[in-house]
Amino acid sequence: MAQSSDYWIYEVPPFAILILTVVATECLIGIIANGIVMAVNVVPWVQKKAVTINTKILLLLSVSRIGFQSIILIETTFSIFKDSLYDSVSYCFSKVSFVFLNYCDLWFTALLSFFHFVKIANFSYRLFLKLKWRISGLMPWLLWLSVFISLGFSMFFCKDTYTVYNNNSRSFNIFNFTAKVCKVETNVVYVVSLFSLGLLPPLIVSIAATTLLIFSLRRHSLHMRHSATGSRDPSRESHMRAIKETGCFLLLYISNAVALFVYMSNVVNASFFWNVVLRIALPSYPAGHSILLIQNNPGLRRSWKQLQSQVHLYLQSRF
């Protein structure tokens, strides 16, 4: 089962520069945001010589996202200004690193959602109570397991599988000055297999954990509303805000997984427009999700405001 398409690839240099500017802005914002997350969580680790599970997950998540954003920025820059990257071993390395870091991002985010669900949700089932008691001991093993799973499945992209049965001997550069015809055949069975093994497990974990957490928060919020005596209940309002934030996280996560699947499968390689959309969409999730994490965490939010004030003072002194 293969899908074939012939298409022309043209370059519009000003548009290419615009794409690079947008992608670079997203990546720099993401790197700064995740750098703040990493710095805020590293300091107590160094001071106290100990780290909580939540801190460990946030550290791994921020490191993987900084690496991912850096690879996207380098790859986009090379694709515009230098074509030789796509004829060398470095191209294969960049693609494997891209997939590995993206898988790690998906797994770490899913495990963060799972950890919050177990810690926050209120269910009386015996299995859930036992899991709540043991979750702190299980999470380090789950984190290491997710890293090995991500590394294992990213190795499938070492040998020409990232472009999924491209009839041409080399990958094309969508910003090439010379117009040319390319033919791409996408093996649907192979792509679905990779999706099922690499992307689907963390996606299922994240959706299940987030949905159950929203259900638990919603049930507790309704209980507080029935038992409340005043017109306004700050605790209930905080629960409703947590439900909205959790739902927003889930929508961002699903959108990123879908965009990654489409990008990896070459389904829209026949469309220059959709290639551009994916190039812009992929780095937006790590940046946006990290900013939301900062906004919802008092310590991270305080560090973010301090950085903003320092940048503002620096700009005032220079200009």
Please name every model-derived segment.
Residues 91-101, 111-143:
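Membrane-interface helix-loop-helix junctions at boundaries between adjacent transmembrane segments
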Residues 24-84, 108-118, 244, 250-252, ...:
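Structural signature of the GPCR N-terminal helical module
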Residues 110-111, 196-226:
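Class A (rhodopsin-like) GPCR signature focused on the TM5-ICL3 interface and adjacent 7TM helical core
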Residues 44-54, 121-138, 211-239, 297-319:
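Intracellular signaling interfaces of 7-transmembrane GPCRs
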Residues 108, 248-254, 258-265, 271-319:
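Seventh transmembrane helix
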Residues 153-159, 179-209:
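Extracellular-loop-to-transmembrane junctions of the mid-late helices
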